[in-house]
Amino acid sequence: MKKRINILLLAGLLFSAVACDDSENNFSESTSTRIEQTLERYKFALQAGKTWVMEYFPDENLGYGGWIYIVEFQDDRMVKAWFEGSTFVEADPLRTESEYRVEFSTGPMLKFATHNDYLHFFSFPGDNGAGYQGWKGDYEFTFMSLSPAFDEIILRGLKTGN
């Protein structure tokens, strides 16, 4: 019986090793080219002369409800933001504009790279009543989908998954 089990295990090992010899290329372009094309597509969609309405859910358990941001992405990697909760923030008007990046990390990502009093309100600790952990929000988002007409982009927060 033990000899049969060993023979079956050896046969399974050999068959699995043979099955790994599939070196056919399924794509016409390299991975890096496809990644760059995807990032360019998202950059184009963000900057397509549109002002975006961003529905934002800061807590992973949706504890704070949804908030509305109005964001405008510019060609020079700057984003202007207005926040529904702007009455809660003593913002310097110059800091409602900050840098953003579209880059590849765990997938194509949108990152609000420099501090913005509105866009980082839920993610940074401080004197906004959130204490040392902040409100547990995101400032890095994974692109989940882009509509063919470039009129809807679905993002998912890296930290909260919302």
Language-model-derived ranges and their functions:
Residues 139-144, 150-152:
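Charged, amphipathic alpha-helical scaffolding segments
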Residues 21-109, 148-149:
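Acidic/polar, low-complexity intrinsically disordered N-terminal segments immediately downstream
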Residues 83-141:
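Contiguous, well-ordered beta-strand patches that form the walls/edges
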Residues 3-10:
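Sec-dependent signal peptide recognition
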Residues 16-19:
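C-terminal motif of bacterial Sec signal peptides marking the signal peptidase cleavage site
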